[in-house]
Swiss-Prot record:
Tissue specificity note: During embryogenesis, expression is seen in mesoderm, endodermal precursor cells, CNS midline cells and trachea and salivary duct ectodermal cells.
Domain Ig-like C2-type: 23-117, 124-230, 240-340, 393-478, 487-585
EC number: 2.7.10.1
Cytoplasmic-side positions: 627-1052
Biased composition (Low complexity): 358-372
Alphabetized GO MF terms: ATP binding; fibroblast growth factor receptor activity; transmembrane receptor protein tyrosine kinase activity
Gene: btl
Location of Phosphotyrosine modifications: Y895
Protein name (Swiss-Prot/TrEMBL): Fibroblast growth factor receptor homolog 2
Organism (species): Drosophila melanogaster
Region (Disordered): 358-393, 1017-1038
Amino acid sequence: MAKVPITLVMIIAIVSAAADLGCDYGHHRCYIDVTVENSPRQRHLLSDMDITLQCVRPMAKWFYEDKFQLRATLLRLERAQSGNSGNYGCLDSQNRWYNISLVVGHKEPVGNDIASFVKLEDAPALPESDLFFQPLNESRSLKLLQPLPKTVQRTAGGLFQLNCSPMDPDAKGVNISWLHNDTQILGGRGRIKLKRWSLTVGQLQPEDAGSYHCELCVEQDCQRSNPTQLEVISRKHTVPMLKPGYPRNTSIALGDNVSIECLLEDSALEPKITWLHKGNADNIDDLLQRLREQSQLPVDVTRLITRMDEPQVLRLGNVLMEDGGWYICIAENQVGRTVAASYVDLYSPSDTTTVRTTTTTTVASPIPTASTGEDNDDDVENPAAEASGGVGPPVFRKELKRLQHSLSGNTVNLACPVYGKANITWTKDKKPLNRELGVYVQKNWTLRFVEATSEDSGLYNCKVCNAWGCIQFDFSVQINDRTRSAPIIVVPQNQTVKVNGSLVMKCTVYSDLHPTVSWKRVVLKNASLDGLKSVEIQNLNFTVTNDSVVLTLRNVTFDQEGWYTCLASSGLGRSNSSVYLRVVSPLPPLEIYALLHAHPLGFTLAAITIVALFLLGSAFITFMLRRLRREKLLKLRIETVHQWTKKVIIYRPGGEEGSGCSSGDLQMPVIRIEKQRTTVSTTGTGGTDPAQGFNEYEFPLDSNWEIPRQQLSLGSILGEGAFGRVVMAEAEGLPRSPQLAETIVAVKMVKEEHTDTDMASLVREMEVMKMIGKHINIINLLGCCSQGGPLWVIVEYAPHGNLKDFLKQNRPGAPQRRSDSDGYLDDKPLISTQHLGEKELTKFAFQIARGMEYLASRRCIHRDLAARNVLVSDGYVMKIADFGLARDIQDTEYYRKNTNGRLPIKWMAPESLQEKKYDSQSDVWSYGVLLWEIMTYGDQPYPHILSAEELYSYLITGQRMEKPAKCSLNIYVVMRQCWHFESCARPTFAELVESFDGILQQASSNPNDAYLDLSMPMLETPPSSGDEDDGSDTETFRETSPLRYQYTYKFN
């Protein structure tokens, strides 16, 4: 026997009745066929027996206390205890009902349950074989109604539920706890919900996987369930998944309106929904299979039209007889298709109908070219709730129980709750309600009749209807006459009392006949349980009141600890129930209380002294704190002055920072600078000069890009413009760079004589570079310094300068020299002239096309693509610059460089010259001019054209620049395609990348040489664009009349 607390229960069986019960007490087995009509309906059995109940074949439904248990032919109770006592019933396939009442051993007092029948009084002897004991942990309160599943698979983002209901869910004092990987789960908020007996985990995540089990406890006695292993599967794209129960079959009266819903689970792929109508189909499964295989629609199938904003709902109005039949819903996405059908049955308004809620569903195999996903098997706690508030027939809120059993004199409630508003009609045995004894009470969805009698048994039907249809349900009500039984005993729980204290225990008895009630005590001698000689039964004195028998114990001693049993007997049988009394020692009095009683005056004076000292100390501390506060405020007024600073405010339209460009063109951030008053300390606690700590501008902090100013060491100036300059610097500890490694970067900043407009331009350029992102063929932003000093924008550094100068210095026959003061390289030759041939120039064009392809994919327009705005980095990697400086296009009708007020008209497309229209295709025109620059080693385009009007006249007549001398025909064909007058006829940058990829492969003797190694890591050291350069070699023209040529030429 396990070492657990046990309850001593003494029961003497009725051995004389064992012969006709089909029981073998020697082997502790009992076999009962509940279908035998002449067998008794109430059985009295011993505990610890294996009881088998049999119902007719095939499988029957078993019920315990009117609650469904399982579907089987046999119901087996292993080592049955008093907790298994109660009413059992089975319902066979012919709806025939059989029931039996079992009384097993002794049942612990719970509510008004019938206690065990015993023969304790008037027993001449107590045979040793009839004495046994019941452990506490055998209670039905700690047995699970159903075991937990061993393994469960769920999809990430789905729902996971477990239920640990005990066999007696109404038992009191039962506590439940849930554990995940042996760690207690604390729910109540977030994704984890704990109800009475259930655990629900929503929005599953990978860390939710593991072992789950529950633990039921009654006082100190606990029992743990078997573990359930949860596996969380990552969510992938799947075919459209229908919500359970959709679409629903329905019945509708002629002339009424009906809505059929094809509701789908949420999915990242937007499905396309199609509705078809098929009349009476002989084999609907064949039709669904053909549709699943994506074959052509049959001739006799009609395609229906639904609202574009609500394709999942098909609405039919004023239905006719030809509208009946099958309605097929096809939901399709890139993975596959799901096909489901529902049947619409039409009837005359005078007929009665029952709504059918079945669905025919089939899922197609995935489309061959799309990636397949896994089915979503997430649980849905209440699928019917999805239909609440919708258009359609009523839907029951919960599953209804057909069989209703009760005893005579009880109140019976029948309920048919539905969602929404509807009318309900009740009938009994297909007739209107009519009760001879008593009345029926109807309230909302409930039918109630009190003091039920056997005449109230019958078939009750509820019919609920609304404007779209009706549903109905049948209740089979069986009212049984109350069987007179042995007395029912209600006793208190186990008691605890202090030694020498008093205790009152009441034993309340309910009986059909006048009972005889008494209190007895069971005494164990020598703490032995091995025989009858160690047990003694003592009679106790008690008093009888109107409704109970009271046992009063005074001056309780330790010897009186033990079991006390209340016995009740009548002509119908005997019952008993026990309670355990525990006697404990009182707590010893504390010494402080003894001293208090001995010296009350001394304790009073000490308390008064402590309180007085506390009050005086509080007053002193309050006075000192107020004085220090006044002195601090006075000192602060002396040490502070007020100055005006400028706050930079950045508005990012089209999404959050870092989200890239929105749909359409790049939405430039709006920069506002507002003045505000700032308090500055004049003494500075750090010992620094206040003037050095004061900043003219206050910038918002962006922790993703902010770099400490101490990590930069500024060097020589690379270039200057009208309002800003670019400085070479050494940076330490940049993100994604080796520790303690120094990186050469370029730092952009405004000059001392700058204006607010100049500062806004630099901030706008920085924000645009943040939104565009990183690519190997564009100048990338590395970070910024915006706090504790002027604004520094840190970008990559390109040591070889811009492409235009690079081509000029490396053209055939050119002297190989460079300036020492430009901050780039010394006079060493950049690249051997014999290697800078057409193939290398084509590689340069290929890289620039890749960079422009990336900008176009980000919906960003360059507006000033030219060789002067392409920088040459380490390894002769081309990097596009100045894409962040097309800032004035949205503020004015054209782009004007702030340095010298000139326009790059020779690189502008015709639509940009005429209408100031800029898009990705106008950048393609500029790319063609850039390609011409590359193939001529940096020559100026259109050398003989001097004005915008002359250039537009030259282009509109169909004239284009001639093929360069050292340019192949394939590359010149690409130039001419970029110079197509109609923008829609020009190739895209993606197509240009493919063209140059093919040209490089054809030009290479080794196929592997045709590809550039562009998978190298991002350079951390390239520079900014050369927007602030003086542009001495840039052929641009001053804008003599900004609007004159806009109206001179018109498109046809």
